[in-house]
Amino acid sequence: MAAHSEQIKNNFLNNPYAQQVFNIANGQVSALDAELNKYPILRQLEQQTKVPKAYGVIALGFSSVLLIFFNMFGLAQPISNLIGWALPAYLSILAIESPQTNDDKQWLTYWVVFGSLNLVESMGLRAVLYWVPMYFVFKTLFTIWLMLPATRGAEILYFHFLRPMVGNVKSRSQSSFGTSDPLAKETGFNPAGTTAPSSFAHEKTL
């Protein structure tokens, strides 16, 4: 019986289709490991735990998917919020400390959208779950799309949705109140479309 099982195992492993699947999987894991290697905190965790970064993230991701999908122990909401907060918070801090301004739109837009989702939850989570039972699954996938450097969904959302919408608001404010805005003197923001210099912007350009 043991010999028969071993033969089946060998036949499966030697199957060209199985080998192709293994090669694709190994390639994806290697690509994920290379991407995760960009983050010092993950490299430190790998050294401390002796668990490869890619396998740790895959295991954590799979566990999170199960907990969110089946809402085990009522953890769907906190885990979804943790996923949507932890990495973006870390990357936002890096963006603040960076002298470049390339990531500002990405993370400012992300926090606006993430905050809006949580505002909707706070006002009527039961109604949301009644109409969309898989809400936390969709929310988690959406926030992952927003945050990942490979997709930069928040930046896409800014240029294709938020920016045109704000442009319409600006044009209406110009036609109704003119271009002068006393608030711009205090905040550095002008609804007419110009932004006054601020100390924060000056620091990031130095």
From Swiss-Prot:
Gene Ontology cellular-component terms listed: endoplasmic reticulum membrane; Golgi membrane
Region (Disordered): 177-206
Ranges in the topological domain labelled Cytoplasmic: 1-52, 96-105, 146-206
A Pfam family recorded for this sequence: TB2_DP1_HVA22
Residue ranges annotated as Lumenal topological domain: 73-74, 123-126
Transmembrane segments: 53-72, 75-95, 106-122, 127-145
Written domain comment of the UniProt record: The short lumenal loops between transmembrane domains 1 and 2 and between transmembrane domains 3 and 4 may impart a wedge-like configuration, thus deforming membranes.
Job of this protein: Required to generate and maintain the structure of the tubular endoplasmic reticulum network and the vacuole. Induces high curvature in membranes and causes membrane tubule formation. Involved in membrane/vesicle trafficking.
Family recorded in the similarity comment: Belongs to the DP1 family.
PANTHER family: HVA22-LIKE PROTEINS, RECEPTOR EXPRESSION-ENHANCING PROTEIN
Name this protein carries in UniProt: Protein YOP1
